């Protein structure tokens, strides 16, 4: 696989691009992410599904811009997929042929099941949870993927999307019809005869927007959307307030950004209906989806689209890019494990902290690559932002703080105040900092 790879996802509402750089066999990092609200499906559901000229031109110009960025980053491989709008459009070949002839880019139009599968591959590899159902709300469709023990059990796609619901129902003020349409489609989820988990992983712009609003409302300390988790019942009031809003000013007061005014009510309506009907108790927000799934199915094509056991892509990527002495890092990790076991009769910490101590020990010197004298502070920022994949928020905050106070005086209450919501008690943090010293 190429060292630098570009993946473009042409959705019904947004077009997104990620550029990813490999640092070793399975490790990689994101070097660019670009999004454009091209709304390629705009007007199509009122016109027999046919793509309209102006939206197609917007999408074409955005693709041209994306490819310029990709070329500037010296990407050697471009994977481009298109989802609901293009697979449904009778005239999709007009757009596909123009892009192929003018830009030299082959777009692969994927079916709904494949779209769902890509979301499942991304979340099962890049989130820490083992059992969940993905809910990926797009402009034209919504995908569901059942995951258990990090294995994909079933992938399905339904023609429920924000733009579709907006044009067919909301624009005609037919809210009752929208609800009936969604519930009728959701019967397919229950027909799979698979137990529906109480935990859902939310994918897509509408769901990420809702999560960001919840984070802001609750003054959540970590500015990271991927892996953010919330209790559904605790946040239903926000969903209801969005649906009650009559003007854009009211939406803005609730925390909705301007670029989401046009579909946030439809997205919230779809999401709330699904959560209620499937009796979902907890939502984990995913910052990854189809694009990362496309990349991972290529990267992991010889390993059943799964990382090896005990492999963490975030840890390996940080070590590849910033660790100055790989052997020393491995030595520190093994040493930390021994220290934890020897002192266990004194600290009585759960074994989950042993794994975090090992990770902290391996990564504690990555900050030296930027500045030796500020290495702990540098490492703190690297870890807080770099342990993005396959880590719960609590875990990455614990690792970052453990490293921050290594070879320093033990942390005090004031040192952990900002992130106390995500940290264990002070005594636990003092033990971890002591053992890494």
Predicted segment positions?
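Helical "lid/coupling" subdomains associated with nucleotide-phosphate turnover
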Residues: 5, 19, 43-68, 83-90, ...
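Short, electropositive alpha-helical surface patch
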Residues: 92-102
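Residue-level detector of beta-propeller blades
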Residues: 30, 152-154
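N-terminal glycine-rich anion-binding loops that anchor highly charged ligand groups
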Residues: 28-39
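A short acidic Gly-Thr/Ser loop motif
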Residues: 9-14, 135-141, 203-206, 287-289
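Short acidic/polar active-site loop segments enriched in Thr and Asp
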Residues: 13, 76, 281
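N-terminal basic/disordered segments at the start of proteins
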Residues: 3-29
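Dinucleotide-binding Rossmann-like beta1-alpha1 core, especially the glycine-rich loop
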Residues: 80
């Amino acid at each position: 696989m190429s060292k630098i790879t570009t993946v473009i996802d042409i959705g019904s509402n947004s077009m997104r691009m990620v550029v990813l750089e490999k640092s070793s066999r399975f490790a990689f990092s994101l070097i660019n992410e670009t999004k454009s609200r091209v709304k390629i499906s705009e007007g199509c559901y009122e016109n027999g599904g046919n793509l309209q000229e102006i939206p197609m031109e917007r999408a074409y110009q955005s693709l041209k811009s994306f490819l310029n960025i990709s070329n500037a980053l010296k990407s050697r491989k471009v994977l481009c997929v298109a989802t609901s709008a293009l697979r449904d459009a009778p005239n999709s070949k007009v757009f596909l042929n123009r892009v192929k002839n003018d830009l030299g880019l082959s777009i692969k139009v994927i079916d709904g099941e494949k779209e769902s599968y890509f979301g499942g591959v991304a979340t099962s590899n890049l989130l820490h949870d083992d059992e969940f159902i993905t809910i990926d709300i797009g402009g034209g469709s919504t995908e569901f993927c059942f995951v258990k023990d990090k294995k994909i059990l079933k992938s399905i796609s339904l023609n429920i999307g924000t733009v579709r619901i907006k044009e067919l129902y909301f624009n005609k003020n037919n809210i009752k019809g929208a609800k009936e349409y969604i519930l009728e489609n959701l019967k397919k989820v229950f027909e799979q005869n698979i137990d529906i988990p109480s935990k859902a992983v939310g994918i897509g712009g509408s769901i990420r927007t809702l999560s960001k609003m919840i984070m802001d409302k609750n003054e959540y300390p970590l500015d990271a959307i991927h892996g953010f988790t919330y209790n559904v019942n605790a946040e239903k009031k926000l969903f209801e307030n969005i649906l009650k809003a009559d003007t854009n000013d009211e939406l803005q007061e609730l925390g909705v950004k301007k670029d989401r005014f046009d579909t946030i009510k439809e997205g919230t309506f779809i999401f709330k209906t699904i959560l209620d009907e499937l009796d979902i108790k907890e939502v984990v927000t995913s910052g990854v989806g189809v694009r990362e799934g496309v990349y991972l199915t290529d990267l992991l094509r010889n390993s059943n689209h799964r990382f090896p056991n005990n492999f963490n892509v975030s840890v390996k990527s940080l070590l590849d890019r910033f660790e100055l002495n790989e052997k020393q890092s491995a030595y520190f990790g093994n040493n930390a494990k021994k220290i934890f076991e020897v002192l266990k009769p004194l600290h009585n910490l759960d074994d989950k902290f042993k794994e975090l101590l090992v990770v902290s020990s391996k990564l504690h010197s990555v900050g030296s690559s930027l500045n030796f004298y500020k290495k702990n502070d540098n490492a703190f920022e690297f870890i807080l932002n770099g342990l993005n994949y396959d880590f719960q928020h609590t875990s990455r905050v614990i690792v970052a703080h453990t490293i921050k106070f290594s070879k320093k005086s033990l942390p005090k209450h004031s040192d952990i105040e900002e992130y106390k919501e995500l940290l264990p008690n002070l005594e636990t943090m003092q033990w971890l900092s002591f053992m890494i010293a």
